[in-house]
C-alpha cells in the first residue's frame, strides 16, 4: 500500500474561490489548487458513476464542490483514477461507518471495472479529511492495489 499524507490549510483557497468548507462528503476537483474559478473545476469522469452508485446502493448524496460542472477528465490508461473525496469532521464523528462504507464502494467499483481484465491494476485516489482545526485538512493520496484501498480506513482513523 503506497500512500502519502499532507497537511493543508484550504480555508484561504476556499475564500479565493468564494466557497465554504463542506460539512459532508463532497467530490473535490482534480485542479482545486490551480483553478482560477469554480467554473474551471475539472473532475475525474468516474465521479458520475460513483455518484450514482453511492445514491442507489447507499442513499448517500455526494455533491461536487462548487455544485454543477461540465468539465470531466477521462484517461486512457490501465490505471484507475477515482475522484477526490472530502470527508467532513462532523460527518466522520457522527457516522462512524461512513469511512468504511465509502471505501467499500470505491473498492467494489474498481473490482467491477477490473473483472475480466488481465494484469495488475493500480488505483489512484485523493481523500481530504477535515481535522479539528478550522480550515485544516489532511490530504491522503493513495496509489496501489484494490485490496489496499480497504485498509485506508485504519490509516484515516489514526489521523484523527
Residues covered by each model-derived region:
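Generic structural signal for short, flexible, solvent-exposed coil/loop and linker residues
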Residues: 3, 14-16, 81, 87-88, ...
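A sequence-composition feature that detects small, non-aromatic residues
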Residues: 35-37, 64, 78, 84, ...
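Generic detector of well-ordered alpha-helical segments enriched in charged/polar residues
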Residues: 48-55, 86-90, 111, 150-157
